[in-house]
């Protein structure tokens, strides 16, 4: 049976990563497996920033956002020679497998290690909810609640001043956060990269809302679709109503994780340990229909595509 495993977090931090780290460590220790934490992601793996962790190492972290292990961008990990040096560090400590918590860039690193014969398990840790093979990623629910609270606050002031608010949220090229926030926050309009938008159609919809007696409007938009300040200016010129853009930015990544994210991270962390005990390497874990599943990590990255949530998108159109 496997005797030593490592765990690292990589890429952008997400609330619930600490809960996942805690789960991996305590589930492994409960089954007699030693656990080593790698600080600062793949950079720390290459620089040998590796330490043995115990149960007390993860006391009082389940409620904390961010990641106790730290994270870092490390483009040089794409180079095979760099990865070989990283594997040499793992072998030096006797670490037989690695649990990687992060987004698609982190998965790519785990895929590369897997292709070199080193077993890895990927856990989806990103607020963007853009990982194939899972309905939800660790951190998405917490970020959604942060965005929803921001929309609630903006609605208060927008109603008071008969103002239109354009709210930019994270998500990179995935509109899940913008759509879920639109439904949960009661936004009038949502703009996502999967669907794009025509400015004339948006303006016509806003005109329709004003004609029906609406005193304000909330528009949620995924980052990178368009310049939100320019869009706000366009809307204000067209309608004559004060329009302001709010870019929520990195506030969406921080804060104490929700109960849903803590439970999801805990389930996935323990499941990763079970898979490694079974001799399963090169896998990534997901949650589908509330059941834990695992996929081949190479197949997940190369062939699986995350489906667009048409139901949620259509709901935003009905409920505005």
UniProtKB/Swiss-Prot annotation:
Localization in the cell: Cytoplasm
Record EC number: 2.7.1.11
Keywords, sorted A to Z: Allosteric enzyme, ATP-binding, Cytoplasm, Glycolysis, Kinase, Magnesium, Metal-binding, Nucleotide-binding, Transferase
One GO CC annotation: 6-phosphofructokinase complex
Catalytic activity: beta-D-fructose 6-phosphate + ATP = beta-D-fructose 1,6-bisphosphate + ADP + H(+)
Cofactor: Mg(2+)
Annotated binding of Mg(2+), by residue: 104
PROSITE patterns: PHOSPHOFRUCTOKINASE (PS00433)
Amino acids binding ADP: 22-26, 155, 186-188, 214-216
Ligand binding (ATP): 12, 73-74, 103-106
Residues at the catalytic site: 128 (proton acceptor)
UniProt keyword annotation of rRNA-binding present: no
SUPFAM superfamilies: Phosphofructokinase
UniProt enzyme class: transferase
Annotated function: Catalyzes the phosphorylation of D-fructose 6-phosphate to fructose 1,6-bisphosphate by ATP, the first committing step of glycolysis.
Protein name, per record: ATP-dependent 6-phosphofructokinase
Gene of this entry: pfkA
